Regions:
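Thr-Gly-centered strand-to-loop micro-motif
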Residues: 26, 202-205, 224-226
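Conserved beta-strand scaffold positions in the cores of enzyme catalytic domains, especially
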Residues: 162, 178-180, 219-224
């Protein structure tokens, strides 16, 4: 894309100065070499809530690492067009890290876990059901909306990917290092990150893992996060903070 010609690689330094901006999301099909379109909820927020008008500067991410500075050209009934002025490239340091999270009984605690992970940089989620999962039903669209909102709020530019798996055996077969958190082990969590490896961090549901589920994984892959019992969402946020 021609917009890459104006790319700024020092994304972190620029983002420090953009800490007060409002960030919008537009998918790749709405982005050309020179123009970005905003439609749907993003358009409504920009025009109805933020009162943006023709000539104003707005910032848009494409969800694949770019933050794009634009100037609004036209505003119509259900969409706006904006001219691309400059692009900022950001780095996905968690590209090879997968957070495997059980469905939690309390929707607000589940929402909290997703939000905080995204704010701290996680971009890959696997939501799974275990034998002791209490929560019923699946709402991937809601989870994706939560992740999208957290991405924009924290000025991140990688749209999180969320995948649903029915059991732990599917995760155990994934290609990468598995790290399982279980309260009843003595081995304390230690982590050395290698950029060329994939890591799967696996968290238990409210009732913990069963013995049969833990047999899917090597004993050396099981760690404790704390001397005290943590709620599932607390363990999730603590782990990503440590990483």
């Amino acid at each position: 894309m021609q917009l890459m010609n104006n790319l700024k690689d020092n994304g972190f330094l620029i983002l420090v100065h953009l800490s007060n901006i409002e960030l919008y999301y537009s998918s790749e099909e709405n982005i050309s070499d020179e123009i970005i379109l905003l439609a749907g909820d993003e358009f409504k927020h920009a025009v109805k809530v933020m009162r943006s008008k023709i000539g104003d500067t707005i910032y848009v991410t494409n969800g694949t690492g770019l933050i794009i500075k634009t100037e609004i050209l036209t505003i119509k009934k259900d969409k706006l067009s904006a001219k691309i002025i400059e692009t900022i490239k950001t780095e996905n340091k968690f590209e090879n890290i997968f957070f495997c999270i059980p469905k939690l009984k309390n929707p607000e605690r589940f929402k909290f876990a997703i939000e905080k992970c995204v704010e701290l940089g996680v971009t890959n989620f696997i939501i799974f059901e275990s034998k002791r999962t209490i929560a019923k039903g699946t709402n991937i669209k809601r989870w994706e909306k939560i992740a999208l909102a957290a991405m924009k709020q924290s000025l991140r530019a990688f749209l999180p990917k969320i995948k649903l798996l029915r059991n732990l055996s599917e995760i155990s077969e994934s290609n990468g290092e598995k790290i399982i958190f279980e309260q009843n082990v003595k081995r304390k969590f230690q982590f050395e990150f290698k950029m060329d490896k994939s890591y799967y961090f696996i968290f238990g549901p409210e009732g913990g893992f069963t013995e049969d589920e833990l047999k899917f994984f090597d004993a050396d892959s099981i760690y404790s996060l704390s001397d005290h019992r943590l709620r599932s969402e607390t363990a999730i946020v603590k782990a990503v903070s440590l990483i």
